[in-house]
């Protein structure tokens, strides 16, 4: 145990997805509540916590490099997060790490911090933590994590082995957190989990309570309640269950944003079966058509994998044909990468790297054309934009169709009479394949 005579300082490195970011926020909130200072440099810190990602091999490598940098620069390091579930792999590369915990092991992380850097004596009234906790996002938007883990066993994914099966947060707790965020000035809530549409499945959608009123633990009920807060609500990681159809009318009514992040992964029934994903492409196309009829303003985001083991040119062509017909607004594409522990590693007919690269390029070229055409349809129209930043050149914001960091932006050149978090009406004047330009109305 170190002898710390000053106000103890903790360095923090957060890697990976928004779900990991929320875990980091929770740990930082507890540390600040206990009187620890959180510092931005290794030099000033008595210890460094690295919250890791282990989803794909490149993320594992990034996490191991971050741990190594923290050890070199500081020497005292605690590791947590998804890669922490693979302690042997970390110890093999970095045996000097003090402690290692898996994901969502908040209490263990704090216990380890207390052991090496004892809790300070502090006046809680002099180190007040905001009621909404420490946030790593800008003040006007926040991620709202509604569950942990996943019940699916997709062959390319190891999340269940690291984060376990689905565990839904009580709906009263989720809604109370959302209310605290709104009271603190948040204008946009991004609902996240490993599987947002499965919310409540593990508790058989039991009835919970919020403000003394009964509320069903389900995605649809959650959306209905969040709509009463008067902010933008955006849904991410929505597995395409049949009941997803039930949230589309809420979007059409303006209760939640007309935005659906629904990872489809592929469009060949054979490849989807190998992935252990839903395989009826025709049914999915029919649903997309129906959703757009109900909510014409709907923005659809999805992710796909090319070069999955066994993928033939015919399978890939099915994927391109799907893109042409579905005309999705926002699309991410990944070249299949083996992940240690994933069932897909054992599948035959691995696709050569040069073929993956060639297919990825063809995929992106087609989707960029589709995205550009979709955005071109907005030129001349008026849209609502939430402002993210303002500088000497103007303002940058996002439309209802744009999630932070992963989607496009709306540029308001020369606009300075706004501030982050403002929601303004903008006339779109120009578009490319990702972004829009316009002027405030």
From Swiss-Prot:
Binding residue positions for [4Fe-4S] cluster 2: 150, 154, 157
GO CC annotations on file: cytosol
Cofactor binding, per record: Binds 2 [4Fe-4S] clusters. One cluster is coordinated with 3 cysteines and an exchangeable S-adenosyl-L-methionine.
Any Gene Ontology biological process: tRNA modification
Gene3D superfamilies: Methylthiotransferase, N-terminal domain (3.40.50.12160), Nucleic acid-binding proteins (2.40.50.140), tm_1862 like domain (3.80.30.20)
Cofactor(s) it depends on: [4Fe-4S] cluster
Transmembrane segments: none
A Pfam family: TRAM_2
Superkingdom to which the source organism belongs: Bacteria
Annotated [4Fe-4S] cluster 1 binding sites: 17, 53, 82
PANTHER family on file: RIBOSOMAL PROTEIN S12 METHYLTHIOTRANSFERASE RIMO, RIBOSOMAL PROTEIN US12 METHYLTHIOTRANSFERASE RIMO
Function in brief: Catalyzes the methylthiolation of an aspartic acid residue of ribosomal protein uS12.
Protein's name according to its UniProt entry: Ribosomal protein uS12 methylthiotransferase RimO
Designated gene of the protein: rimO
């Amino acid at each position: 145990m170190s002898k710390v005579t000053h106000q103890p300082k903790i360095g923090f490195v957060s890697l990976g997805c928004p779900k990991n970011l929320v875990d980091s926020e929770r740990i930082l909130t507890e540390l600040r509540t206990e009187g620890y200072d959180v510092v931005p440099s290794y030099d000033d810190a008595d210890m460094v916590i690295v919250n890791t990602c282990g989803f794909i091999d490149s993320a594992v490598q990034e996490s191991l490099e971050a741990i190594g940098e923290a050890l070199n620069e500081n020497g005292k390091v605690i590791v947590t997060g998804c890669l922490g579930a693979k302690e042997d792999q970390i110890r093999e590369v970095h045996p000097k790490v003090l402690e290692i915990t898996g994901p969502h092991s908040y209490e263990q992380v704090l216990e380890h911090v207390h052991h090496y850097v004892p809790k300070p004596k502090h006046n809680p009234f002099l180190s007040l933590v905001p009621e909404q906790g420490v946030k790593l996002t800008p003040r006007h938007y926040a991620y709202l994590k509604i569950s942990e883990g996943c019940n699916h066993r997709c062959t390319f994914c190891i999340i269940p082995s690291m984060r376990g099966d689905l565990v839904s947060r009580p709906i009263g707790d989720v809604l109370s957190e959302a209310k605290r965020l709104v009271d603190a000035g948040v204008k946009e809530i991004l609902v996240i989990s490993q599987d947002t549409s499965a919310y409540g499945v593990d508790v058989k959608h039991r009835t919970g309570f919020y403000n003394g009123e009964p509320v069903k633990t389900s995605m649809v009920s959650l959306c209905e309640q969040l709509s009463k807060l008067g902010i933008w609500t955006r849904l991410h990681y929505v597995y395409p269950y049949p009941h997803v159809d039930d949230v589309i009318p809420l979007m059409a009514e303006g209760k939640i944003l007309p935005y659906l992040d629904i990872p489809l992964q592929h469009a060949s029934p054979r490849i989807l079966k190998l992935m252990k994903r839903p395989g009826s492409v025709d049914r999915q196309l029919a649903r997309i058509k129906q959703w757009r009829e109900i909510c014409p303003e709907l923005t659809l985001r999805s992710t796909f994998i090319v070069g999955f083991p066994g993928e033939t040119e015919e399978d890939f062509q099915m994927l391109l044909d799907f893109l042409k017909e579905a005309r999705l607004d926002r699309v991410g594409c990944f070249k299949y990468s083996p992940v240690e522990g994933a069932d897909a590693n054992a599948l035959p007919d691995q696709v050569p790297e040069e073929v993956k690269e060639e297919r990825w390029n063809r995929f992106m070229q087609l989707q960029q054309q589709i995205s550009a055409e979709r955005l071109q349809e907005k030129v001349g129209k008026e849209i609502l934009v939430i402002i993210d930043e303002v500088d000497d050149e103007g303002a940058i914001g996002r439309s209802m169709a744009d999630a932070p960091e992963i989607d496009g932006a709306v540029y308001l050149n020369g606009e300075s009479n706004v501030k982050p978090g403002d929601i303004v009406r903008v006339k779109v004047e120009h578009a490319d394949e990702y972004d829009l330009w316009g002027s405030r109305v």
